[in-house]
Amino acid sequence: TSVQIYYKHPAFPNNQKNTVQYMVQNYMISMACRMLNGRLSEMTQVANPPFINAGVGHSDFLLSKTTTAFTGSVTCKENEIPSSFTTLMREIERAKKFGFTASEYERAKANYLTSVESAYSERNKIKNGSYVNAYVRHFIDNEPIAGLEVEYPIAKQIAAQIPVEAINQVIPQLITKENIVMTIFGPDKEGVTYPSEQELLDIIKNVQTEELTAYVDKVSNEPLLSEEPTGGKIVKTEKGVFGSTVLTLSNGIRVIMKPTEFKADQIQLQAVSPGGTSVFGTEDVEQIRLLNNIAGLGGYGKFSLIELSKVLAGKKVSMGTSVGTLTENVSGSCSPKDFETMMQLI
């Protein structure tokens, strides 16, 4: 079951899209949505979350090309629409009244700059399909196609010059009292009830009169590793197949390195050790079935999943673990500049 609320606005004029003003508006709205989505995502990590999923965004209103909309959406269990929708509207109202914190903005800005920097680094590896999509959007909607060589320095300049105070003015401009559309999607079956239009409007009105408090951003300044591990040594170097290099470390680990030109801003890693679920006893069969699903929810060391995402803000790095029948596996990828962070996560 899901509920959507749309706050409609006139679309940015097509004949003015080829301006820095258009890039500035897109940046500011994107930052506001990114930070609000971060708050909503945090709420799904608690023991009894108020909804299954929730998020906000800004795009064309359905199929319209002359109207855009700031959209809030929440997915919830059957018959829990009132409470879930109330929570969504409360967080939107909180952002409208108090804005975002400086630390939230620094993380959002760091992640944004990392993404545009990565795109710029990979500009010579862009697939033809991406060019086709860009040209179609330019032809239909007059979206700019200046190219990354032009857009990248402008994007960095915009991010450097716009403070969080300016971003905090975005949500109040998008949340209006008129031109609101709400939709509900859910199963048509016995026992499932849905709120009326007036009930949804009453929820919005009640939230607006609540005495809300500002969001508190809890950030840890602790490093990923509390202490540096003792370094090992390379005891053997040899040539491998297909132009690879094989290193044998003092702890017995074999490292196979293979340089490629597929991507300019990515290092991929795959680590495997023998063992897997085959070494568990039969009494652990039920737990083993859930092992891989649960492993990714536990964060890292003393950092919860929420805290870890904040610590890794601005870094292009991902890491995952899995247990197969005969092996334990670690996989990851990162930008070359974040290689040390990836190794710390391992």
Q: Where do the PLM segments sit?
A:
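M16 family metallopeptidases and their MPP-like homologs
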Residues: 2-20, 40-161, 179-186, 256-258, ...
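Long, His/Glu/Asp-enriched segments that create or flank divalent metal/ion-associated functional microenvironments
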Residues: 3, 12, 23-25, 29-33, ...
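PPIase-associated folding chaperone regions across multiple families
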Residues: 20-31, 163-166, 171, 279
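Divalent metal-coordination and catalytic microenvironments
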Residues: 30, 88, 167, 252, ...
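Noncatalytic, helix-rich "gating/capping" subdomain that lines the substrate-entry/channel surface
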Residues: 31, 35-36, 73
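Short alpha-helical segments and helix-capping/turn motifs at coil-helix boundaries
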Residues: 38, 57, 164-170, 241, ...
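C-terminal regions of mature proteins
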Residues: 106-239, 244-248
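Mature N-terminal segment immediately following signal peptide/propeptide cleavage
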Residues: 243-259
